[in-house]
Amino acid sequence: MQALGRHLLLELFDCDAEALNSLETVKASMVEAAKRAQATIVDVVFHEFNPFGISGVVVIAESHLAIHTWPEYRYAAVDVFSCGDVLQPQTAANYLIEQFGASRASVVELQRGIFLQAAPMPHKPAGAKLSGAKLSVAKLSGAKVSGAKVPVGG
């Protein structure tokens, strides 16, 4: 089986509430996470809610990084979706876990666009390969990590 991309789903618990409620901090952290993962940034859009919370997305040539924060619960939900094999989504995830001071994190990796047979890849350079399909729960940073493994047929 082949997959078009990797999608990390992060749940960050017991974070720094002030950091999660600061538009500048959240935006700068997400942009830096994209850079550290070697992503090509295309656009950055963030919104600050009243009385608290931030939502935003860093659109990258390889897909996106998105975040929704709940400072009142010291919680953030983050997606790091990457197509191709250059981007390093774990690097972005580790950086965000550290930046927001999460003492507990759930990280689940999904393979997106799984094909049972080799498919043409008009969006990739000639000779490029798709990622091998798998699903895993990764231990990142020093935070406690939990998650469930889901079998993928092969």
Predicted regions: what is each one?
Residues 1-154:
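Polybasic/polar functional segments that serve as interface/processing modules
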